[in-house]
Amino acid sequence: ALSSAASDVYKRQYQVIAPKSIDDILYEGDTLHHCVNKTDTYFDRIVSKESYILFLREKENPKVPFYTLEVEPDGTIRQKRAEFNRQNKDIDKVTSFLTLWQKEIQKRLTQKDRKSTEESRKLRQQNYQEIRDKHVVVHGGTFAGELLADLLEKDLMDLPMESAENEESPTEIAA
């Protein structure tokens, strides 16, 4: 667990924000040069409430794309990607902040959220199995030649409910 001082640093450094419109998501994908705006998959998941697109920003530059997040209803982070689908050198600090953010989100879940989460997890697992069975490989960039399912599973930040309930978390994190 992070010390209180460390969590305060992360709270001052980052914020998670929701896009105001589809145009925000399209701009994010164009600016960071990744796939969030190049496929209907993410928009279909938003409509079905399987997952959502959120943006991680540095507080000092809230309008500048930093990381794009794909997040399930319970705060499980499926993907966190910076420019060109990479993760920057600061990924450990980013991941620490996102873990704190997840704990805050999980404290606020309703019964309806929890039910949506079960369906979202099931769909994610089915998708991972499907792309693994088809041996879907990344074709370009840093991860060329790697199995997509392996990359997605490695990026997954799934915080067990028990962990969220039993550990201390900061009182304020932008949601």
Predicted features by range, described:
Residues 1-175:
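Catalytic-core elements of nucleic-acid end-processing and repair enzymes
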